[in-house]
Amino acid sequence: VDLAAARARQASFFAQKDPTGGVALILGAGNVSSIPPMDAFTKMFVEGFVCLIKMNPVNEWVGPILEKALAPMIDRGYLRIVYGGGDVGAYLCKHPTVADIHITGSDATHDLIVWGPPGAERERRKAAHDPQLKIPISSELGNVSPVAIVPWTYRDAELAFIARNIVTMITNNWLGDLASAPDLGFIRE
């Protein structure tokens, strides 16, 4: 993807005269309760989907709170929140009304959704680039959010600011937060 292609796609949903939309399934990991609604907002307001959030059983307790907070969107039919385990998630991933999936979680869950259960058939699918999932999926898996420090002439205050933010991100990751930075890369000229 080059800059021109990225700019052409930026906010492209808003330029469509008759957007297609559809139902986006949000499968949130259980460690950060704020991520599923944030992912739903992105799918709704940036990409034009109505959303179905399937709560992780670890965070089912926050579902009623989200239902109350998001009642205006739920009442108008733009959002639903459902509960259950992996069986419910598997059913929803294959439901004919689901047009898009976003998952926050493990690569094992992602691969189960995209390629199927472990075994010879999964390996065949991977080798042939033939996923069992035939709809788009976006994934935030196992914390693959590196921080890159690019070469620049930084002032001391800028370096201190960057350092504080990196320490905060790494500290957050002690909680297993998929959105915090686990890796730090230095780019040399």
Predicted regions and their residues:
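Conserved small-residue-rich beta-alpha loop and adjacent elements
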Residues: 1-77, 144-145
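Short alpha-helical segments and helix-capping/turn motifs at coil-helix boundaries
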Residues: 8-11, 86, 169-170
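Short acidic loop-to-helix transition motifs that present clustered carboxylates
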Residues: 33, 83-88
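Short acidic-hydrophobic sequence patches enriched in Asp/Glu that either
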Residues: 58, 62, 105, 158
